[in-house]
Amino acid sequence: MIVQAEHLNKWYGRVIALNDVSLSIPPGITGLLGPNGAGKTSFMRILIGLMRESSGTMRVLGERPWNNPKLAVRIGYCPEHDGFYEGMTGRQFITSLARIRGVKDCAAAAARAIDWVRMADAADRKILTYSRGMRQRIKIAQAVVHQPELLVLDEPLTGSDPLVRQELIALIKSFAQEGRSVIVSSHVLHEIEQLTRRIVLIHRGRLVAEGDIRNIRDLIDRHPHTVEVKADRPRDLAAALAREPEVVEIRFDPTAVWVRTPHPDAFYAKLPKIALDAGTEVREISSPDDNLEAVFKYLTET
């Protein structure tokens, strides 16, 4: 295992950031999922040795991360928020960090990292001129310039446009394909689905679930859903839906029907025929429960 945590706790005064987290992370790519404020960043900061746990233990690549400079150079870290010297060029920034990490040929290492993130054409421009996507690539370049065994990425895809997101996903995958490991955090399930099937779910500082992403998808599909169905004749549709065993609660207004169902898969499968038989046209279907927040709430309340 590349990471092992046992009864890990972190608190800031009365605020609990991590609450008795025990987990093991194998080699490869692992997604760390949770809403904002879940404890993901605190977990990552302990993992890279930037912060000490309040109690419990964390081992990374077999070693304790706190106050361990030899381990630190085996890890690459890309923070969520920018921390650039804006007046530097991308090349100067990466070269400086390579030097701090003790890389022997800093210029050559920086050039390799810049080429790897496809920033050679803009490497000698000042960072203050970079777009968000370019800044993200430079942040990833500094995280890999010393060729770490483990790459830790905190919300690397946040705010990126679709094209940049796909480019970043390809870079992360290529790093892992070289036999190294990645831990990447996100609060968006479909982002992680494009990277890996191995995920860890954290909510309010607690480990909620871990394992194959398909199992998490099953949780999303199986937990009770509230479904909004916009239709041209909501009253007629509501009357038809009220007879269905999958529906446990129903209400409607002049534009839509809201249904509560413990069996969303069966409900979605039957809805088209029910609407057709009721002589109503379904215009839109949506569910506020088809997301990670709802899964976290469901798991922590059951």
Indicate residue ranges for each PLM-predicted region.
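Alpha-helix N-cap/helix-start and coil->helix boundary motif
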Residues: N9, P65, R91, L189, ...
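ABC transporter nucleotide-binding domain
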Residues: I169-P262
